[in-house]
Curated annotation (Swiss-Prot):
Residues 225-244 bind DNA. Gene3D superfamilies: Tetracycline Repressor, domain 2 (1.10.357.10). This is Uncharacterized HTH-type transcriptional regulator YxbF. InterPro entries: Homeodomain-like_sf, HTH-type_Tx_Regulator, HTH_TetR. It comes from Bacillus subtilis (strain 168).
Length: 380
């Protein structure tokens, strides 16, 4: 396929993805949008998924090259001395905005950045020779904070230039501290729960447990029906509708409940800047240990197709951090995005690659990166 036609096909799919999920887009629509014949399209692409995979690989290669070109002449990177430069990732996102605008709000897209950061350039803490586990955790950390920054830019400050966002980013990361992960309780967040009748609580808990059981059996969110849930819970269908309008509302309630539990583990009585590193390690290790018993574990399984989980987690965590009284001079909403991404990234790492490591090790290794301000540039 000529390069111009290939570019048209990719742009056509991205344009269609602005309004619909890829599951609801046909090859016929892509061909019509790109102004190519279906026959020509099928000569080069087996299906629509092979097109989006091709687009993603192009973007990974492009971003990797941009990072390599930006850092290959450097030995070190000091966050306090980069205020007048444009972040190379942000320049690339600006150049390919149509792709990132479509993809950023999709579940698990942070892995795009993790793949890129493992390919060409590694920014390692200046005085540390990273072990394999530290390198893996750090790659996840760097991927998530990049994801959070771009998410903030596209969703909260879309009119800003890459130069303006870069200045905000350097301002933020030059101040970063491990205790940013923690905060004080937000008044009134749990008052409604305390007032609910115990019988109502028991019924809802039974429905939620049944939903989890059915999800584990079917391993497909789309295939779950209200009848499945009521049969499993032995609760009448009419009773289900007394509590939830549909399975989506039930799911939202359970995600919010899990997020509240996560936030409980991050809530401390003292001011965060008085929290010691040892106390932070202990609190984070307890959260990682408790994670396996939370419903959110099932919802984060990519194979089961549960929608909106990561965006909903972002909203809950962002709200918690926005309510904190901080002495941070950077943009507060950017700070909330950044720290929320840190937590979500760590939890995702724990559920995937981090299963083999003790929670205490993950907590310790993760927290040490949050205070690093100076990095050595390692070409891979």
């Amino acid at each position: 396929m000529p390069e111009s036609a290939e570019a048209q096909v990719k742009e056509a799919l991205l344009a269609l993805l602005k309004d619909r999920d890829i599951q609801h887009i046909t090859m016929k629509e892509i061909a019509e949008k790109a102004k190519v014949s279906r026959g020509s399209l099928y000569l080069y692409y087996e299906d629509k998924f092979s097109i989006i995979e091709d687009v993603i690989e192009d973007m990974k290669e492009g971003l990797g090259k941009a990072l390599f070109d930006a850092f290959s002449h450097m030995d070190t990177l000091h966050l306090n001395k980069k205020r007048q430069t444009v972040h190379p990732t942000l320049s690339f996102v600006h150049e390919h905005r149509s792709f990132f605008s479509v993809m950023m709000n999709r579940g698990h897209f942070h892995r795009f950045f993790k793949d890129v950061f493992q390919q060409d350039v590694l920014l390692a803490p200046i005085h540390v020779n990273l072990t394999p586990i530290e390198r893996d955790i750090y790659g996840h950390y760097r991927a998530l904070y990049t994801y959070a920054i771009i998410l903030y830019w596209l969703n909260e400050d879309a009119a800003a230039s890459p130069e303006a966002i870069s200045q905000k980013v350097w301002e933020l990361v030059s101040q970063k501290r491990f205790y940013w992960l923690f905060g004080k309780a937000v008044p009134g967040e749990r008052e409604k729960e305390k007032q609910i009748d115990r019988r109502v609580v028991r019924t809802r808990e039974a429905l939620q447990k049944a939903f989890l059981d059915v999800l584990a059996e079917k391993q497909d969110y789309a295939g779950i029906t209200i009848s499945d849930i009521t049969r499993k819970s032995n609760i009448r269908r009419a009773t289900f509708y007394d509590h939830y309008a549909n399975k989506e509302e039930l799911l939202q309630t359970m995600i919010q409940r899990s997020c509240a539990e996560i936030i409980d583990h991050l809530t401390i009585a003292s001011s965060p800047n008085e929290f010691s590193l040892k106390e932070a390690e202990k609190a984070l290790a307890i959260l990682l240990s408790a994670l396996s018993n939370m419903p959110i574990v099932h919802f984060l399984n990519r194979e089961w197709g549960v929608p909106h989980v990561i965006p909903d987690m972002f909203k809950a965590l962002e709200s918690f951090y926005l309510h904190q009284q901080t002495d941070i001079h950077a943009e507060k909403k950017l700070y909330a995005h950044y720290v929320s991404a840190m937590i979500i990234g760590l939890l995702l790492y724990r559920l995937d690659e981090g299963k083999a490591h003790p929670p205490e090790v993950l907590a310790r290794e993760f927290l040490q990166f949050l205070d690093v301000k100076k990095y050595k540039v390692v070409l891979l």
